[in-house]
Every structure is written in C-alpha cells, then in structure tokens.
Design a protein with these regions (language model features):
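Short, hydrophobic beta-strand segments
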Residues: 45-53, 175-176, 351-356, 401-407
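Short, ordered loop/turn segments at secondary-structure junctions
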Residues: 94, 133, 357-358, 385-386, ...
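Short acidic/histidine-rich active-site segments
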Residues: 121-135, 161-167
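Short N-terminal or domain-adjacent regulatory/targeting segments
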Residues: 21-28, 316-347
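Flexible, glycine-rich loop/tail regions that form catalytic "lids" or insertion modules at the edges
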Residues: 141-142, 146-153, 157-334, 397, ...
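Helix-rich catalytic cores of soluble enzyme domains
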Residues: 1-116, 130-150
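Cofactor-cradling patches in redox/metallo enzymes
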Residues: 366-416
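Glycine-rich phosphate/diphosphate-binding loops that line cofactor/substrate pockets in enzymes
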Residues: 39-41, 283-289, 338-350, 394-400
Length: 416
C-alpha cells in the first residue's frame, strides 16, 4: 500500500524493492536455507502493488518493476531460473483517488486503473482487487462488490485484451518512460540501501511518504492536480445511486454475536491442549524454535488469533510505527501568516489531539490533518494508528488539548 500512503511511482518502486532485499538478505544470512534452495525462496517473493489513475505512468511503473526485479535476482542473488525471476504481484487499484463527491465517477477511475495492470502482458498482475465505487463513503454492499467483480469478468471474458502478446512492446513513449522511472527508482533504492536498508531507515521513509502525500493534498487544494467533481466540474445533477445512504449498514448486534461465538468456542474446546500449544508458541518465540509450526499447532488445538497475538506481544512487545509527522516537510505556503497569528494568540497556540481508533492502518487522513494543524501554528499530539478508546482518553487527560480530532474509516463516523 505504498501508493496509498503517499508514495510517488519512483518511491513505490524503490521502497518495495528495498523491503524485498531486506527480507532476502536476512533469509540468506540466517544460514537456515541451503544455497541450492535459495532460488525457491526468491521465486516465492510476491508484491502487493497499487495502480493509480495516470494510465501510461502506471503501465511503465510495472514494466520498470519487472525489469528491476529480474536485475536484482541475477546480479545480487545469482538467480538464473527464468520462472523464479518473474516479478509476481497482486494489485489493488487506488482507493486513494476515489471521491466522496460525485462518487459515480469512481467507476471509470477503477476501470482505467484496472487496465493499467492488465494490458501489458510482460508486466501483468497475477491477481486484481478492485474497490467498490462507494468505498469513499463507507463499506460497500454485496451488490457493490459484485459490480467490481463484473468489471474484471467483462475484461477477461468479453474483450480480446488478454489474447495478444504485449501490445506496448516497441512503443517509444512506453520504453522511454519505463527507462526514466527505472533509473530514478534505482537511484532512490541505492540511497535507501546506503542508509542501511528499508528496515533501518523506516522513519526516514515514512517521513518522505507523509511529505509526498502532503504535496499531493496541496496540489489538489490549489487546483494544480485536477480531480473531477472535487476541484473542477463540480456542478452535478442529482445522483440516483443513493450517496451516503448507499453503503453497508452493519447491525450493532453483530458485535455481540461475535463475542458470543468466541465465548462458546472457548467453552467447548480442550483447554489443556490450548494451554500446551500456547506454552509451545511462547517457547518457540522466545528461543530458536519455529514460530510457524507452533502457530499451526495452536490453531489446530483451537486457539484464537487474539490469544496468538497476546503471546507475540508478550515476547516481542508491540511495535509502534513512526508517524512521520515531526520530520516531514510540509507545504505551509499561504499558511505562514496564519501560523504567525496562531502562535501569537494569548495563552499560546491551540493544542490539537489527533487520534486514530480502530484496527485499520489507513493513516493518511489523520496525518494530513496533523500536518495542516502543525503548519497552521498549532501544537499537535499524534501517536499514530490503532489506538484504543481508553488510550485516547488517557492521552486527552494528560495532554489537555483544546481540540480532539478522530480519524475513522468505513463510515463509522456517520453514527457519531
């Protein structure tokens, strides 16, 4: 989801490759995989890529990634097996560009983004995940999801788009842009590797992603990046699709049903077997045992994902991802005068607490609000994603903010 987090095409290529290199280097250096089996490990690596609205650029991005991955395999790891060298990726077309305003326009956006990852045979996605037209409003209904599935089926079974060799081979425009993206991404990758790799430089990479997203937000706000229905062609007839009412409404009783199911499951299982499996998992995680084997054994004994996660947190602690807010470069621009006035307010600048409750990792909204508040001269408190309600309340008591902003996904805010 690098593009969803703000990555430019160059950053998306480079950071994805850097992450894969870190994983492969760690596997090779562990000594657990015989040298003659490393080709299988390399061939098992797959990527999850985003596809955006800039069709030609997206086609070239995937062709560049295909070429770079093969080069990395041959030159860094000595892979010669042609099948193992293939760039394997699944794709979700870009939800970031879907709009709440005139959401019917999202249909053509989704189709164009799907075409970008399917038309070039040499760089074609192995699997495609399409969002629904109304996901900027909330959770889609089963019918909305079916509509997105039918888009893929029409492409696969009614058109001839998948019947030919790569239709972009020989195009000067495609080849030139592919080369340009590959060279720029290689320079970015070299810089990340010089910093110690993706894992060692995660705070730097996150900061760059936040800065890129801030720049995108500024361009849209200024009208430099056109979004139809949002900053151009904003007049609209009344849409018959239902707007904010045309989303899935989850029955609040479902939560209690799930709790009852877990309670019933735990009451009917062999608790002694679960306890033994949990102890085995804890031992494997604490030592050199196989966490995967212990995890499978726990599942077969009837353990839950919550119990598995509790053991992992007990052994390894809980990772709190960097927010990227403190060091990201903002786009203050016309906010400079406002920031000066805000900082000069009697009693000091307002303090705002930005909080992200829930389990989803879509942090763009919270980050961009935090960046805008910071660039407006406010003091910002933001601890990142996946905060519990109790944690947010405790932070509010401790920090005593003047304003609390909650970033919530899936239309949950409509009930507030």
């Amino acid at each position: 989801h690098l593009q969803e987090a703000g990555a430019t095409p160059v950053q998306e290529i480079a950071y994805a490759m850097a992450t894969a290199i870190d994983v492969l280097d760690a596997v090779r250096e562990s000594g657990r995989i015989p040298e003659d089996e490393f080709t299988q490990v390399f061939g098992a690596i797959s990527f999850f890529v985003n596809a955006g609205i800039r069709f030609v650029e997206e086609v070239c991005k995937l062709r560049a990634m295909t070429e770079m991955w093969e080069t990395i395999g041959r030159e860094r790891y000595g892979i010669t097996d042609e099948k193992a060298l293939r760039f394997r990726y699944g794709v979700q077309v870009n939800s970031l560009g879907l709009t709440e305003v005139q959401p019917e326009n999202n249909v053509q956006r989704i189709v164009l983004e799907m075409l970008a990852v399917t038309l070039s045979k040499r760089a074609r996605a192995r699997s495609v995940q399409l969002p629904a037209w109304n996901e900027a409003l909330g959770l889609p209904t089963p019918w909305d999801q079916q509509w997105s599935l039918r888009m893929q089926q029409v492409l696969a079974y009614e058109t001839d788009l998948l019947e030919h060799e790569d239709i972009f081979d020989g195009s000067h425009v495609i080849e030139s842009m592919t080369t340009e993206l590959r060279e720029a991404a290689q320079a970015e990758l070299d810089e990340v590797l010089a910093l110690g790799g993706a894992f060692a430089s995660i705070e730097t990479l996150k900061s760059r992603l936040v800065s890129s997203m801030t720049d995108r937000t500024r361009r849209i706000g200024a009208g430099d990046q056109v979004v139809v229905g949002v900053n151009r062609f904003t007049e609209s007839e009344t849409a018959p699709l239902g707007g904010s009412e045309a989303i899935l409404r989850v029955d609040p009783a479902v939560e209690q049903m799930m709790i009852d199911d877990i309670t019933s499951w735990r009451a009917s299982r062999d608790q002694a077997a679960v306890d033994a499996a949990l102890a085995n998992l804890r031992s494997a995680a604490s030592g050199d045992g196989s966490i995967m084997e212990a995890s499978v054994a726990l599942a077969r004994a009837g353990g839950t994902t919550g119990e598995w996660g509790a053991v992992m947190r007990e052994v390894f602690g809980e990772f709190r991802a960097p927010t990227g807010i403190a060091s990201a470069s903002g786009a203050a621009g016309g906010l400079a005068a406002i920031a000066e006035r805000v900082r000069a307010l009697p009693g000091g600048p307002p303090r705002v607490l930005i909080a992200k409750p829930g389990l989803d990792g879509h942090s763009n909204g919270a980050e961009q609000i935090a960046m805008a508040a910071r660039d407006s001269g406010m003091e910002v408190v933001y601890a990142g994603i996946r905060s519990t309600v109790d944690e947010i309340a405790a932070t509010a008591v401790e920090e005593d903010p003047d304003l609390i902003g909650l970033s919530i996904l899936s239309g949950s805010h409509l009930e507030l």
